[in-house]
Structure formats: structure tokens, C-alpha cells
């Protein structure tokens, strides 16, 4: 898949520069590292580095989506609910939440300098952000190497929000499992992989309001299903996507793509991600077969 070619090229270029620096004599190394910062060594231009507009290799994906409006965003400010900022107000409205986590990136420090690790992890994170933006995602929060994203909003169908979340995370997972894996295999680096959790909360289950104080605040959601997205990420297998049963229901995607989350022995890890025995509420976590879905 050449959709992420620009991102892969950037990672390869940064790794190549690191090899050159390491091969230099100590005196030259000392001089070279003084200029070895994120901006000077990054293969991306400053405009592309700080823009939400995806890199050129993702253009075919954008075109397949039709007219995609890429607008600048602020973390913690979904445009449909940013009016709640600096208020005591709240509002109920559905949303699909997705938590994308990148695993094993700390192992890069065994082989590369902090500057190179920064460039590699930032490039991977940008690939996730750009992919989600193409599918209408709103970047809510960056958590370490991870990305927390909202899909949906006012004027967007509930089905579309869930399908867009599945599409975005499926493409990104393919990138990590295949394209990115090849780069690190060539370098003898331990696998970097992703784990993703997605859940949908309906209008009466998601409360939007402000968390924090002043500038140390964000417009966020208070919902069981927002919390469960992160929890489902935790039980996903390497390069797996785990979704709540609401996602299956609201997306209307064929049930053949959903199954119990199973371990390497084929045994079910966890049938219910949340249980409230007093209310007889048992909420399923399901593995989403993104690979077959993309075929």
C-alpha cells in the first residue's frame, strides 16, 4: 500500500542520517549533533510538518472520500461543542470515540538518539492524525504516542460516525502492521504495533462539558462509552481493533467481521468489557477483522 509512502520515506531518511552521524569521528559527531534537531533533520517541510493536511501519498485516499474539508483543529475543542468552553454548561449528544495506542516505541531508544526517536514516533502519530482527519475525525487528545479521536457530531449520521472510525483505524492499522513493519525489520528493530479501542455512545449516554480550569481545560465527554474505548484498547491483540457492541449495531456492517476477542490459543479473553449485575447490563467487547474488511 503506497498511501503512506511519504511517511515511510521520512522515517527511512531520519534513520539514514542517524547512521551517518554514528559513523563520524567523535569530533565531527559532536559538531553534527549540535545541528541535529527535529526541524533540521526532518524530511518534511515546515508547512507540512505542522499542517493537518495529509501528505501527498494520502491524496488517493482523500479523493476516494470525495470532497474532504481539512480544517485546523485545537485539541480538546470539538467544533460542535467548543461553545461550552469557559462555561458551566453541558449538552447531551452522541459520539464515537476511538483510542489509538502505539506500543513498543520505547524500544527505539536502544538503537537511536532521542532526536531520531522523536522524529519516528511523531511521523507515526501524524500518520494516525492525518488518516483520522480524512475520515472526519476530531483529534481530542494526544496521550504519549497515542491519539484519542472523536468521530461524529451535529449534522453527521450516527452510522457514518461509526463507519468512519472503523475505516480510519483499519487503514492506519494496515500501515503499522505492513508498511512500518518492513522498515523496522530491515533495521533489526523489535516490532512496533498498534492497539485500538472504539465505542459508540448514544445521545442520552454522552454528556459534553468542560474538564479542568481556565487554559488547563478541554471540552470533553462524560460517558461510559468514552471510557470503554480506552479500556477496549487494553484488551486488543497486537495490531487489533476492539469495538463495543454499539459500534456493531449502529454501523450496520456485516456481522461476519466481528467476533469475540481471543488470545493466541483461540480462547475468549473477555466476553463483557463492562458488567452491571444489579441492572443486568452486560456489554460486549468484539474483535473487528479489519484485514478482511479492507479486502
Model-derived regions: residue spans:
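Catalytic beta-strand-to-alpha-helix segment of the class III nucleotidyl cyclase homology domain
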Residues: 13, 154-271
